């Protein structure tokens, strides 16, 4: 641990933990979502503002996604140690749901006119879409099916990120995503 960073974290109300590993993997912005934090989210004034301007459930949803990212990181470490066959298929589903959160919500293309600036309405729509997927139970026989399926899903969602909000193209990708979810959803 680096002393300047550790001492800064003690006094800072908001901290972006830049991570070389994320930069090396081209996961931009290269900010570690687990080590980064904002104390402002705990302030009652901020909570009131969010409830009044966005949604009563926004902070809870953000905290849920952070928890899912943490769980995904823990499972990734287990997979690295035990191998893909060494963990249950359900662990792969949890891991890939965390990857979905990372690729679709946290990563951003600063060179894309649409993805570079995301209005709050669009953020809320995408956040709800991803949370719904995270709450969906899927059926897979092996880890390869999980990986292939979620890579397709991530690709469709990324295309939505590059499409103008509520445009025909955006709606088309949304329809494609719903069909993809229905393919493996236990409840469909």
What do the PLM-derived regions correspond to, one by one?
Residues 1-158, 166-169, 174-177:
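P-loop NTPase catalytic core
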Residues 172, 176-188:
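C-terminal accessory/interaction regions of large nucleic acid-associated machines
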């Amino acid at each position: 641990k680096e002393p300047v960073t550790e001492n800064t974290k003690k006094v800072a109300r908001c901290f972006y933990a830049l991570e070389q590993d994320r930069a090396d993997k081209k996961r931009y912005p290269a900010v570690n979502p687990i080590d980064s934090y904002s104390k402002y989210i705990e302030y009652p004034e901020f909570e009131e503002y969010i409830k009044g301007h966005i949604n009563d459930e926004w902070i809870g949803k953000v905290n849920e996604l952070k928890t899912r990212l943490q769980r995904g990181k823990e499972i990734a470490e287990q997979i690295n140690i035990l191998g893909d066959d060494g963990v249950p298929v359900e662990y792969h589903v949890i891991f890939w749901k965390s990857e979905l959160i990372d690729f679709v919500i946290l990563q951003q293309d600063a060179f894309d006119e649409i993805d570079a600036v995301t209005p709050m309405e669009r953020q809320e729509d995408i956040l709800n879409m991803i949370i719904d997927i995270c709450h969906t139970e899927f059926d897979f026989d092996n880890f390869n099916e999980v990986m292939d399926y979620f890579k397709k899903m991530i690709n469709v969602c990324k295309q939505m990120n590059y499409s103008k909000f509520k445009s025909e193209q955006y709606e088309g990708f949304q329809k494609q995503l719903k069909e993809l979810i229905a393919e493996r959803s236990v409840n469909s």
